[in-house]
Amino acid sequence: MFMNRWLFSTNHKDIGTLYLLFGAWAGMVGTALSLLIRAELGQPGALLGDDQIYNVIVTAHAFVMIFFMVMPIMIGGFGNWLVPLMIGAPDMAFPRMNNMSFWLLPPSFLLLLASSMVEAGAGTGWTVYPPLAGNLAHAGASVDLTIFSLHLAGVSSILGAINFITTIINMKPPAMSQYQTPLFVWSVLITAVLLLLSLPVLAAGITMLLTDRNLNTTFFDPAGGGDPILYQHLFWFFGHPEVYILILPGFGMISHIVTYYSGKKEPFGYMGMVWAMMSIGFLGFIVWAHHMFTVGMDVDTRAYFTSATMIIAIPTGVKVFSWLATLHGGNIKWSPAMLWALGFIFLFTVGGLTGIVLANSSLDIVLHDTYYVVAHFHYVLSMGAVFAIMGGFVHWFPLFSGYMLDDTWAKIHFTIMFVGVNMTFFPQHFLGLSGMPRRYSDYPDAYTTWNTVSSMGSFISLTAVMLMVFMIWEAFASKREVAAVELTTTNIEWLHGCPPPYHTFEEPTYVVLK
């Protein structure tokens, strides 16, 4: 019975729960890796050994957080749980494929861990650039295992994307048009389209790298007429949409949370929000070379990528100001989920501002591969994506489990996390502006102060992670059941009680649209 339910599940709620659990465990692995990085950088001098092991940890940290924490939780966890409930579908369009999407992830994770255990590990950075990732600089199986890991994670995401696109377009009630679906459903749909279009390009790039390493091809080897810059173009054509894949479902969740705790029945500017997400998705595909300003592109190419990148700030601004307009005049409830959402809006905006700075190719020549870039993308990921996940988790936890988290603990947790991540990443702007380069395990003494502050901040964040584990334990131990849910009229995922029955919407829903 247990095996049938959890190994062969075709139920979107069970699979969503599996994704959430997997993402939580992977998140703890990723956090452990990040603390190793900060421990190494907490003081000048070596701690762990050589730069190879340091770079293996950095590479693993990135892959674990992106492919095994953020994507499984946002798309697999919240997506699976909420999309069918929000559109009134009985399940996903392809329930068995849904199960396969999940079960491809543990083997993929295993291959990634194996890559760091054999030989010297893959110390390439998450970009896996040749010639460093070639079979001279990285002899042995490490990089090959990493490539296979990415293949599996990629197949998992592509199958999931097909499933979500089909479900969202095809499984709404007949009376419901696409423009009446909630914003979270829209965000998952757009994310799925981005995955479907970008991942095959990554697959092509890393497969060529695999044959370069093992079958004597020369796609990226100038000696045989290849070009390492080709790899960079292929990688970043995936890599840039990927960062929007990581944040878009978060946008959807934040829209729901802000609307809910402002006491509003709908977000401000629904169509503007949809249009903004579609614009961000489209523009995300035509700005990839801003990651490559230092490889020597023509001045007109650099001018184009600079301006195209800056244009993304417009739809992003539409979203930020629409969230603020949703808050305006509302009956604001200062719940933990609302705190996460407000923290998201503020810190994501800060991360966006440093992104505008980096979009300038002339400035990026100086700031590329410094800690300024690290600070920028950790503000939008560690305080954008993660804050959205935390906000979504404390908001929908009663729906998933039927139990309530302790409000006071949840607010303390938010406060500790807020202090921790800011103390970790704000000083990195100063380090970057002072020229401290990324991906080195040691640094000149001049950089000591801010690195020490940054490392202290990371340990504050660690206490927040541990507190969250305690909070979840406390909720299941105390078993405070959900009495009543407000605003069910506009949030139909809450309509069937907490938690909802194993099968919801077994008969097609009758929808009256006003």
UniProtKB/Swiss-Prot annotation:
Which parts of the sequence bind O2? 244
Q: What does the note accompanying the cofactor annotation read?
A: Binds 2 heme A groups non-covalently per subunit.
Catalysis: reaction(s): 4 Fe(II)-[cytochrome c] + O2 + 8 H(+)(in) = 4 Fe(III)-[cytochrome c] + 2 H2O + 4 H(+)(out)
The entry's Cu cation-binding residues are: 240, 290-291
**How does this chain sit within the bilayer?**
Multi-pass membrane protein
Mitochondrial matrix-side segments: 1-11, 87-94, 171-182, 262-269, 328-335, 401-406, 479-514
- Subcellular localization(s) per the UniProt record: Mitochondrion inner membrane
Q: EC number(s) for this protein?
A: 7.1.1.9
Q: Which GO terms describe its molecular function?
A: cytochrome-c oxidase activity; heme binding; metal ion binding
- How does this polypeptide assemble, per the annotation? Component of the cytochrome c oxidase (complex IV, CIV), a multisubunit enzyme composed of 14 subunits. The complex is composed of a catalytic core of 3 subunits MT-CO1, MT-CO2 and MT-CO3, encoded in the mitochondrial DNA, and 11 supernumerary subunits COX4I, COX5A, COX5B, COX6A, COX6B, COX6C, COX7A, COX7B, COX7C, COX8 and NDUFA4, which are encoded in the nuclear genome.
Name of the molecule in the record: Cytochrome c oxidase subunit 1
State the species of origin: Phoca vitulina (Harbor seal)
Q: What is the lineage of its organism?
A: Eukaryota, Metazoa, Chordata, Craniata, Vertebrata
Name the gene behind this protein: MT-CO1
